[in-house]
């Protein structure tokens, strides 16, 4: 280090002698410029290196002198830059400060700095030929310029570049910056040499102290007239020579001779003639450079910092520290611009980055000063803007030696292509990027107000998600300036907070839900630090939905306070009424986030809150939990004892309670992926307070700031999602939006296993049911008609009935009921007999004259269509309305074969006009032997539309063989499912029918296919057994299912209407076995029809219902008094409802 300082002092003394004698220098000598003494302040505590920053006071009289000589400097220096030009850049401020990097220690010839390793002068070597400005030799060089040719002219041009900045440094005490001064010597102007040439000729390439031409625009390498002095052998020899001769007064002359000697020997070995320029004796004196000259160690450091971000930042009055967490991103951005140096002419990209850099330097310099010197301003050294570096490189390449750079045409073409591609970007992308940056600034301002640093987990996660969403939405075009986005946003957030504290366009609306007595209203009061709502520890204080608004830290916050909910299963009706009020209220004011409140000290291991959470899910939908935060009050409660009898830790207690609440929400929402954030709250007046006056939890964290940060972060992410339109713009191939889902196999399998009736011809549609043919041949003809065997019967008049006794009247009624039953049975048998005869006649006629049955059927089917008859009234539910509009649902059948009817919502509130869709049906015959039907229904409410369409046709192809085909369209969720099915039924035996079918469903770009097999067996006259099974597969998934149904009919069915059915169903999907059983029975008790139903599954859930209908037992109406009395008792005493206040 001492040797380098001596070397610098030798160069300064030599400069003082040569300054006046140089004929090429048109600038004023540094000694002629009056200067104030150098002021050295005390040690800067913020400086990481601990060095004393140097402040140079520039007097006002220097400015006028420099302005006079500026024009002359530009003419004489050419592309160089004088000391007076540097003074002009410092006019905006009278004090310029800089702090060069300080070497901490030397390791293997390298100086170790705080943020990296910089090569020492001895190890770096010399990167080509040095051009020394010796006065005598310069005159000889001008005389022999015509003989030297191109190489000599290049040397003369470079020798004209004077460095008055070196003389400026001579007047200062910069002995402590020997390393940096030495690095300044190695700056050159080899702009005409490309990177490819440097790689192809490694033996001629010298390593520079700074990154060199590969990393610095315009190049920092030495001239290329003596390229062959770059071998490690003479570098080590040169290093030894430096160390041995630094203390010698003639070290520079010997050094110059040594350079010439070593270079000559090396070129002699290569048989290459090299023309050396005139080498002056002052090695550390003036140095020829290109237009981007560096005047001092601090300036050199600023230029190197532009391409190497690992250097420690300079401490100046206009420089702000960069957040530690984003240093790596800045380094990555620097590498991006370094790698694309050769063809980097993208003005749009440079403009984006220059915008961030220029905004960061507005305070310290004017625009004109920044343009004149990108690396120097009134406030001290700064990073040069990259677009000006590119222009400097191009100007140096065209003015150096006239040798064209390789691949110039291709580079220009690629640059033009790049410019065209960037210019083709729509203005919408730039607008989105600007708005997203404003969102970042807004969030950083909110975080500052909440005293949260960018290293906070929530803040960092939100910023990461914003960057990720921006990348997914805009691709690489929006990702180029990612390294500058945070620094720029953070600086603007700090400036806006300092200038306009109240000017923050942000408001948050929060919906509060939770059980009664958990502290919802108390939390609202704690957040506003004032009593906004009335609270009570003994009874619920909030009786209706209302809004509480105020300002917290300059942010408008609005709470929607709701009455407390009750956790009991019997109170869910009360909860539904409250949530319907909330749902009606939020239609006017939409909330940004939902807070679900619960108590921290509620130790419940059961699923008692599941009914409450499911009620919330049913009313608001499962999406209510996607933007919800769990708030646990009474967070200062001491943890209970663990299983071993010792109190558990506070963190473990919080994690255990949070996990239980989150698991309950997942169970109620039906989504195992939910992970709602949890925030802790303590509203007790005796809560601990820190030095800042904030209420803190037992773990020392202020809960108010954390809760507000979660709410604000959710609102910020929602704004970004709305701006970027991720869900709308996403496709199934992208991470967001609709993805290809597995079809609902259990639902489709249940539809496949369902038995469907075969279509019949119009003349065959007189049977009672599909099973009427099964027992038509089994009627006992030998029994005859019992009604005909009865003795004659004379009905009695009313007077005669009054004369009879009670027993006689009862016997008369029984006799009359038996005769009525036998008469109905006789009519039923005659109907079956006629149908059998008609079938036989149709089969015979089809064999003899195929055309006659068709014509007859056509006439018979067309005759009733020509007469308009009233249709039967629709079955309406019982209603106590005085104006029940039954007349609205009576229609007339027209001659048109299409039947169109409205669809009535029987359970809707609108009894006057409760239409929500229409139904279309039509039956027709294809080719006189294939019956077909088409039906469809469309329903629409305010939110959803349902579409159901079905087309079916039956084809008979032999005795007892029928094939049914169909096409269905139905709405499943938000998608349409298209199903094609076909099944064939054939008779194996007289009492056995077998059905086999296939189906295929197309849903959401997925096809699900399945098969089924069904067998129907009749056992005697009263028992029917149906067994079916099937499998459905789609997208690698499978579902298996089957069912068994046994039916027992009464002796006189269908006259007696006695029927009992036992069913069992099994389904296996994803290894989850679902078993269900159901039982249904109906029978007559006198003239009262009794119907009982019961079902149970393997998960323990079931249902039992009993229904009785009678036209004689009017006392059954008294059963309706029971629910009326229960409602009155609940309203009076509060059982099952809201407690009375």
UniProtKB/Swiss-Prot annotation:
Compositional bias segments (type: Basic and acidic residues): 57-72, 107-121
List of residues binding GTP: 517-522, 634, 682-683
Gene Ontology, cellular component aspect: chloroplast outer membrane
Gene Ontology biological process: protein import into chloroplast stroma; protein targeting to chloroplast
Annotated AIG1-type G domain residues: 505-734
Family: Belongs to the TRAFAC class TrmE-Era-EngA-EngB-Septin-like GTPase superfamily. AIG1/Toc34/Toc159-like paraseptin GTPase family. TOC159 subfamily.
Keywords, ordered alphabetically: Chloroplast, GTP-binding, Hydrolase, Magnesium, Membrane, Metal-binding, Nucleotide-binding, Plastid, Plastid outer membrane, Protein transport, Transmembrane, Transmembrane helix, Transport
Stretches for region Disordered: 1-177, 325-431, 758-795, 832-871
Positions of region (G3): 561-564
Regions of compositional bias (Basic residues) in chain numbering: 832-841
Chief location of this protein within or outside the cell: plastid
Organism: Physcomitrium patens
Name assigned to this protein: Translocase of chloroplast 125, chloroplastic
